């Protein structure tokens, strides 16, 4: 009995100690992850409480998309800024499910080896590269498209540029110059 109790206490102690080391090693994973919505959910929320919409266009096979999920989108600064200033949408650009957006139904198009979703093609102006990010204003009008993998230090300036409404009066390069 004593040996079993000692083993149990030892095992529980190891679990607590190892979980404590995770924080000591500087694990910067956010405790407030990004709240992802479907496009339909984001539009419905936007009607009740207007906010800009951030759309992450991804595919299941995209390695850089997965890397952004594991690094950039788990960064606390990025996650908090996105949650506070945008309704965030994760949109699989090859999903088979029809989507109604602004009164129009968008469908999957079986083309080539994988196909694509018409909404992704429409929002990305036919430039289907992944990851790509689409920013919409409160009227669901596209502000800009931002293609490619981005580290937290690369995406934060563009999030602040769009989220803060600076795109209405400044070009991005002017905004960056003022921020430095």
Task: Report the location of each language-model feature.
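Short, internal strand/loop/helix patches
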Residues: 105-127
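Short active-site neighborhood of thiol/selenol oxidoreductases, capturing the structured segment around
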Residues: 49-63, 88
């Amino acid at each position: 009995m004593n040996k079993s109790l000692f083993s149990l206490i030892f095992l529980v102690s190891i679990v607590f100690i190892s979980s404590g080391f995770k924080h000591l090693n500087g694990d910067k994973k956010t405790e407030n992850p990004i709240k992802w919505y479907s496009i339909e959910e984001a539009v419905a929320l936007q009607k009740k409480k207007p906010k800009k919409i951030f759309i992450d266009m991804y595919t299941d096979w995209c390695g850089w998309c997965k890397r952004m999920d594991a690094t950039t989108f788990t960064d606390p600064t990025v996650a908090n800024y996105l949650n506070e200033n945008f309704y965030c949408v994760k949109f699989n650009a090859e999903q088979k499910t029809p989507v109604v957006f602004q009164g129009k139904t968008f469908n999957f198009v079986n083309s080539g080896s994988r196909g694509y979703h018409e909404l992704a093609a429409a929002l990305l102006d036919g430039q289907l590269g992944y990851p790509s990010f689409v920013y919409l204003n409160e009227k669901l009008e596209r502000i800009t498209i931002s293609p490619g993998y981005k580290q937290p230090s690369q995406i934060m300036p563009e999030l602040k540029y769009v989220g803060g409404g600076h795109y209405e009066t400044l070009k991005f390069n002017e905004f960056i110059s003022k921020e430095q």
